[in-house]
Every structure is written in structure tokens, then in C-alpha cells.
């Protein structure tokens, strides 16, 4: 099993603070905020599949925004009252990584949710690399596009 120090070395200081200590990267600074390539987003810690580029939208909030996870079972939501706010925190199911928060101000036509996710918690797998990286079963997500 990987130690905290090994994990920090593998994913970097910011990703470690975000995923392990629920830190938040500064708005408009994340690698995937203004990024709309075709592919999937996985947990930077565990590699578990989380979001698809098909569900990503520009919310203007300063962080990557998704209307939904690829499958609801892939994330865990729970109430977060830190910093005097009432929010719903989003974590990855397997690794328990802090990803961000979900809000009810997303596109109505896509279900009304906005998953506001830290870039530092994610790793993007380009569509062309999905099979090589071990994510071939998710290629069918893009069959109709």
C-alpha cells in the first residue's frame, strides 16, 4: 500500500492537498477548466472512471463543470457545512478522494446539476488513448458522437 509521502510524490502537492485534505484549487487556474477535448476524466489517485467530456460544460465558475458522473454509483455525495456554507461534497467511491462539490444550478436540460470539480483531482484520458490506458469498455460512450 502506498504511503502518504509516496502518494504526494506521485500526484504532486496540490493534487494531494485537494484529494486528501479537501483543499480547493484557485478558480480559473486548473488545467481542465477551459478544456473540452474528447475523452474521460478519472480520479488522479486511483484511476477510477468519473466523468465524460460529453457531460462537461462551461459554467464560468472557474473549475471544470459536469452535468453528471458517467454513472451515479461512481461518486459519493455527502453534506458539507465547512466554512459556514451548506454544500454537497463529491468524493470518488473507491479512493474516497475529495473531488469538489455538486450544486443544483446546472443546465436544466441536462438534469439541473453542476458538478464543480477540482482539476487537481482529475486525470484526463484522451479518447484516442482510452484503450491503451485500460479504459476500452468506456469507448461506447462516444458511439453516437
UniProtKB/Swiss-Prot annotation:
Signal peptide: none annotated. GO terms for biological process: protein repair; response to oxidative stress. The active site is at residue 116. Keywords: Oxidoreductase. Residues 4-127 form the MsrB domain. One of its GO terms (molecular function) is peptide-methionine (R)-S-oxide reductase activity. Pfam families: SelR. Its EC number is 1.8.4.12. GO terms for cellular component: cytoplasm. It catalyses: L-methionyl-[protein] + [thioredoxin]-disulfide + H2O = L-methionyl-(R)-S-oxide-[protein] + [thioredoxin]-dithiol. Belongs to the MsrB Met sulfoxide reductase family. NCBIfam families: peptide-methionine (R)-S-oxide reductase MsrB. HAMAP family: MsrB (MF_01400). This is Peptide methionine sulfoxide reductase MsrB. The gene is msrB.
Amino acid at each position: 500500500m502506498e504511503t502518504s509521502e509516496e502518494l504526494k510524490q506521485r500526484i504532486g502537492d496540490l493534487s494531494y492537498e485537494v484529494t486528501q485534505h479537501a483543499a480547493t484549487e484557485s478558480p480559473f487556474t486548473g488545467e481542465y477548466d477551459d478544456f473540452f477535448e474528447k475523452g474521460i476524466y478519472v480520479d488522479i489517485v486511483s484511476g477510477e472512471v468519473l466523468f465524460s467530456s460529453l457531460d462537461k460544460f462551461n459554467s464560468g465558475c472557474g473549475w471544470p463543470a459536469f452535468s453528471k458522473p458517467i454513472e451515479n454509483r461512481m461518486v459519493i455525495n455527502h453534506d458539507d457545512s465547512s466554512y459556514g456554507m451548506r454544500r454537497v461534497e463529491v468524493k470518488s467511491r473507491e479512493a474516497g478522494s475529495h473531488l469538489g462539490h455538486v450544486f443544483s444550478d446546472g443546465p436544466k436540460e441536462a438534469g439541473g446539476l453542476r458538478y464543480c470539480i477540482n482539476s487537481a483531482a482529475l486525470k484526463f484520458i484522451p479518447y484516442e488513448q482510452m484503450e491503451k490506458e485500460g479504459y476500452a469498455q468506456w469507448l461506447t460512450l462516444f458511439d453516437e458522437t
